[in-house]
Amino acid sequence: DSLYITAGERGEGMIAQDPTKHPGSIIRIHLDGKIPRDNPKFQDKKNWLPEIFQIGVRNPQGMDLSPFDNKIYLTNHGAKGGDWFGEAKFAENYGWKILGWGGTNYTGSKIGPKWKPGFTKAIKYWVPSIAASSMVIYKGKEFKEWNGDALITSLKDQSLRKIKFKGNNFINEKIIFKGLIGRIRDIEIQESTGIIFLLTDQGSIWKLQK
């Protein structure tokens, strides 16, 4: 009964550390637009906007609710490197722009450490950047051996990747294909069959099945 919304930091960097502003945050509201009374502000984050669920993201791209553990997962663009896949976590901070997630500014100058205690740690980082875009937690019959894995598309890398993970622990990554159909913008799973559909920047829709 909740709606999760992501907001990029619009090139403003440290604004993602300001919980009184929306850029660089994850927002949680009810479907009727009301604010959940168990959001961070009503717990121990008194200075946060009441609708903010988490701060410190840069440019979120894909987001999905896992049908296996009922958690929210997302992909996020770093700068020059530092894309990541991770879990949206209540009242936590992914660290942008205190952390660089392994990447640098586009000028090549350093940003900050990849991660340090006190901040949310992503499940998987990519350096150099793959320009991670959409994602889903796969559930279906067509590729039942993938159930519970994250399927992540990319723009620059033009790939479809499968991430196996448990909790917040990365297990392995497999590139399903790369450079075959162009920049992949979106991914959807047909619920009744588990067949995968991919949308490219060229406006083409591709179907992936056995």
Annotate each predicted stretch with a short phrase.
Residues 1-4, 70-71, 149, 194-195:
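Generic structural signal for coil-to-beta-strand starts
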Residues 9-174, 182, 210:
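Beta-propeller domain segments
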Residues 186-210:
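Blade-level signature of beta-propeller repeat domains, shared across WD40, Kelch, NHL, RCC1
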